[in-house]
C-alpha cells in the first residue's frame, strides 16, 4: 500500500485475535482478545489521526493499544505468527503442543531465533514492544491458529508472508534461515497434499524409487 500512496498516508496497525472460522462466520472471545494496536511510524506519535481513531474506539467494547513503536510491535506479531502458527500446522495439533513437547518447543525457538536475528539486522528493537505483545490472546490447548485452520479447510496458507518473507530477508542480509526454509517447504507440501498432488491411484500409481 505504501508503495502506491506513500507511507505518510498510512496509520500503521494490526490486530491480535485468536479467531476460528465456522459456517456462520468468524468466532472469537472479546474478553481474552488482546486487540488492536495502532500508532504513527514517527513523531508526532500523539497525532490528530491517532486521537481520532482513539475517539472512534471509545465506548465500543473493543480492546486497543496506542503505541509509540508500531514497527517493533508489528515485528512482534510477525514473530508470533512464524513461531507459533507454523510448527503446529505441520503436525496438525493444538497449541498445547509447545508446552507438552520439548521437540515442538525447540522448533518454535529455532524459528524465533531466526526472526530475532533478522529483526536485529534491520535495526528493529524487539525489547521495545508492549508486554502483551510477547504473547497471543489466551486460548485453550486445543486451539488451532490460522495456518492450521487453512490446511484443515483445504485452503492455501499465508506461508509466503511468513517463512517465505524470512527466507527472502535472510538472503538479503546474509543470515541463514534453515528452520524457516524447512518449514516453508513443509507447509507448501501440505498445500500440495490438499490439492491432490499425492493421490496415487490408477494410472497415477507409477513405479518410483528412493534417490
Q: Predicted segments — roles?
A:
Residues 1-73, 77:
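Rossmann-fold dinucleotide-binding core
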Residues 6-8, 63, 94, 125-127, ...:
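Short coil/loop linkers at secondary-structure junctions
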Residues 27-31, 82-84, 196-197:
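Short, hinge-like loop/turn segments at secondary-structure boundaries
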Residues 27-40, 91-100, 144-153:
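Helix-loop-beta segment of a Rossmann-like dinucleotide-binding subdomain
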Residues 71-99, 103-116, 140-142:
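Active-site-proximal catalytic alpha-helix in oxidoreductases
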